[in-house]
């Protein structure tokens, strides 16, 4: 649910905020014992707010420590993020200028650029904070296929409202008002019939059928009535 603390929790791992209580460990080591730069080198973050520069697609994907990576590696990340189709269709390919804050790209394209960045970084920990929130259904299918490969061999934390993006997770954690109210696999949580199962039903089972425009309006009655993983540990 919105406001339950999901993104705040994800922000604690790279130490955008420091936890006031408890301990977060990475491979058994308190994250506060890492040099901040060293800790963040181990983490790739894809958030719902994608920051892009008024520069080429190439320089928006490979920058900072990755600026000297060759085009072959960049294109491999682009392909795995399923961004190659729209990049190849652009007039200058990787050399296309995207405008201020990526104004020339759609929301889904921006998200796939952010995912390509994370793939290129190849960090052992990947945090996806509503990373598919701006994708249409077709784009989401492409990204879901890519994520199966991307998640292999690394710890991945996925923050999601769209439950289709987390059904294959090893552990699903349900938060409410900053507290864990449920955790388990997708099937375990469905079988339990509690919060997760209700959210899942609301998204996938209780979608109203579209109205038939050819169906006549019902006749009014004489008396109308209103119807009623991982590497991270926390302690």
Where are these regions (language model features)?
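ABC-type nucleotide-binding domain
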Residues: 1-235
């Amino acid at each position: 649910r919105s406001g339950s603390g999901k993104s705040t929790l994800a922000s604690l791992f790279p130490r955008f905020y420091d936890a006031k209580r408890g301990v977060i460990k990475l491979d058994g080591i308190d994250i506060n014992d890492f040099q901040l730069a060293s800790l963040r080198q181990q983490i790739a973050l894809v958030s719902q707010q994608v920051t892009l520069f008024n520069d080429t697609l190439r320089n928006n994907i490979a920058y900072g420590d990755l600026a000297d990576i060759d085009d072959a590696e960049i294109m491999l990340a682009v392909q795995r993020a399923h961004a190659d189709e729209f990049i190849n269709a652009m007039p200058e390919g990787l050399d296309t200028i995207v405008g201020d804050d990526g104004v020339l790209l759609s929301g889904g394209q921006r998200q796939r650029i952010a995912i390509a960045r994370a793939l290129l970084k190849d960090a052992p920990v990947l945090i996806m904070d509503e990373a598919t929130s701006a994708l249409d259904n077709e784009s989401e299918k492409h990204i879901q296929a890519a994520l199966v490969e991307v998640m292999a061999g690394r710890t991945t934390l996925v923050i999601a409202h769209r439950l289709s993006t987390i059904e294959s997770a090893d552990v699903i954690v349900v938060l409410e008002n900053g507290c864990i109210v449920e955790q388990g696999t997708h099937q375990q949580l469905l079988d339990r019939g509690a919060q997760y199962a209700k959210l899942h039903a609301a998204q996938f089972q209780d979608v109203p059928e579209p109205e038939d425009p050819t169906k006549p309006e019902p006749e009014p009655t004489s008396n109308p009535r209103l119807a009623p993983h991982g590497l991270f540990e926390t302690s």
